[in-house]
Amino acid sequence: MKKIITLVCFFLSAGTVFGQQTVFNILKARALTEAGKPDQAISLLNSAITEAKESSLYTCRAEAKILKGDYSGAIADYNEANKITSFSGEYGLSRIYALKGDAATSLYHLELSMKSFYKKSEKEILLDPAFGTIDNRQEWRQFWKKEWYSVSEKSISEIEYYISIGKVDQSRDVLSEFKKNYDNNSDIIYAESLVNLASGNSSQVMKDVSGLLSTDPGDEKYLRVLAKAQTEASDPAGASTTYSQLITSGVIDAGLFLLRADCYQKTGETEKALNDIGKYLEIYPDNMTALRLAGKVEVKSGDNLKALQYFSENLKLHPNDPECYMDRANSYFISRSWDMAINDYSMSLDLKPENSDAWLNKGISLLNSGKTDDACHDFRISFRMGNKRVTDYLSRNCIK
């Protein structure tokens, strides 16, 4: 059931900006449902709904109810969402009737969704496991014979696909054909920006997307592309501002907090970075990436003791990840706790022996512990792996 019930809480309402508490409640509820705790998610959303009658809260609660097998309750919530914001629950209703095996009713609601602001991409629909129960039906095949997507939508989707699999040249070919038949409208500029971003031309992307945003300042997809381009152009201050626009506009994506935190740590805004990571960890307390980033921010700020706490917590949660050992080893290395560093580098190398930096740092730790022969052994392994930084250590300590 958990595999079939892919979370698709439908967060954005046309013309609606959610308050930050609503955003947090939805993110937390989604995390609980993903973790297989639908009862806790429903309890949280019940309380949230008493404070704010948002369609997104009802669609999220419907997903938690589906995971519990409460299809009737989920249908009621999707219908309630539709009353608050037209068509916001249609895709969810389509999914739930597909799960029930009712192809006709499922496709009725899917058609309503396709004609609305909530229209999903073809790829997203076809990959949605909820429709696996009806995708072999004649009604399903007939449905997809209709032209649901414009040439612009199809071209952009194809460009995104080729970029996602690393075939940038093919994405350029699609863009070229697209431009032959259409004027230089916003879709063309956006599509070209995707190709330019994938090609490393971030300065052109920033110029073009800024132009698009001047006429449509709140467009989520434009803001996301701009933030990526700013990051690629080594402009973390600009990227953090763009991510702030996305967050304050009510976009429901916990990952935005980590992206902004990474920008803040690059600009030296440690408190802001840790605040964003803290928000993310409230939602996903066991997340390896967030705990790692928190530790690295603390290292950069000079609080190595706090960094060790984050890295140790990460290791407790993810004991088979070599990078978690590497993170803590590097922290011990900075504090000159050589024996502890050696132990963690060794554990990391047991899991990932091809890490030349781990061999180098373990060798340095051994050298500082007075174990020159063992250190030289590690230096030679690192050198054979192509690590040029080890050369001085070899020449000074291991060549007699």
Question: What do the PLM-derived regions correspond to, one by one?
Answer:
Residues 47-48, 80-81, 113, 178, ...:
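Canonical positions in the second alpha-helix
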Residues 22-23, 55-56, 87-90, 121, ...:
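Helix-start (N-cap) detector for alpha-helical repeat units in TPR-like alpha-solenoids
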